Amino acid sequence: MEKKIYKHEYFGELYYLVNVPEEYKNKKGAPMLVFLHGSGERGKDFNLIAKHGIPKYINEGMKIPAITVCPQCPENFIWNNYVFLLKDFIEYAAKEYGADTEKISLTGISMGGFGTWEMAM
């Protein structure tokens, strides 16, 4: 997974990992999967993002037929506090990587599950 930093005008930097499968590079209309990690992976450390869940599986060789983006929640915060940042980030990632905005899925574990629920509300 590639290491990237998204810069937001109000929230500052958001570290994230991205995986674009070969079949979706330089093409538009791909599905996109957004993975939110748990509370133990907050901060500004790419290795923490890849510790559990989908980024770990991709690094171990799992093929996911979608663009996968995995943002990192800033330290001392929870995803529930960052719904507006997540919304902006997802819009940015969809445009940046050519995802179909009708084919975006959001998932998470632990604190990331709560963030997923909050985004759905």
Label the predicted regions:
Residues 1, 49-54, 88, 111:
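Short amphipathic alpha-helical surface micro-motifs
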Residues 8-10, 18, 60-62, 91, ...:
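A generic structural signal for short, solvent-exposed coil/turn residues
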Residues 113-121:
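Short glycine-enriched nucleophile-adjacent loop
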